[in-house]
Amino acid sequence: MAKVTGLPEFEDLHTKRKWMLNHMAAAFRMFGRNGYNEGTAGHVTVRDPIDENTFWINPLEVPFSLMKPSDLVHINSDGEIIGGSKMKYNTSGFAIHYEMHKVRPEVICVCHVHSIYGKAFSALGKPLDMLNTDCCVFYNNHGIYFDMDDVISMPEEGRRTAKGLADYKAVLVQNHGIMTVGTTVDEAAYLLSLMERSCQIQLLIDSATKVGERKHVHPTRAKAIRENADNPVGLYTAQQPNFLYEVACSNGELEII
């Protein structure tokens, strides 16, 4: 069994790229296993470790559950395909993500899916309540992007979404769904799955209780939990059981680097 704690270090950036693409493909398989797919909607962008002005993104025609490293598409900052599988990808999605990468240069990965509970909760136009300790990683750590009535360009949509994200790790895009960011694919993917479950839990609680009956995590405790949990090593480590599961189920299409 591979070591799952701590971020790996690489002397060779080509090896790091191979590692990154395996983890990216595994994240998509996890999204598919959890039912986060909606047709061709949903995309992940990852900054390339060799040329940091270029990115990797998923192709439109490959199902999340079947994603392989060789399927992923390498593009430059203008959205031009420069390598990888060279299959068609969501150009509008990249235009939005690119603006977020520009505003937050420390962000390596941006994840966005059209998951059921994320879409449902986003329609409320409000942030998550801290109703359990797991979701406290999002305490004062997620924003809201309120969709405007006007029709705008994708780059402008990206700039507005980036404003909603601010310095946080996640943003709820009203009537649309969840976006998360991280310094690794694993961090962003884990945060996305955690936010999706947190939306599900809050919707369950909202349907079963009156406002005054709910018990919130005390702000002091919520802040302490976030400060302890919200770090690149811890969030990367939290995703590794999911990664190893997808490798084991991949019939050799994914590998541990």
Curated annotation (Swiss-Prot):
Subcellular location: Cytoplasm; Nucleus
Pfam families: Aldolase_II
Principal localisation: cytoplasm
GO molecular function: actin filament binding
GO cellular component: cytoplasm; cytoskeleton; cytosol; nucleus
Biological process according to GO: actin cytoskeleton organization; meiotic cell cycle
Keywords, comma-separated and alphabetical: Cytoplasm, Meiosis, Nucleus
PANTHER family: ADDUCIN (PTHR10672), MEIOTICALLY UP-REGULATED GENE 14 PROTEIN (PTHR10672:SF25)
Function: Has a role in meiosis.
Official protein name in the record: Meiotically up-regulated gene 14 protein
Gene expressing this chain: mug14
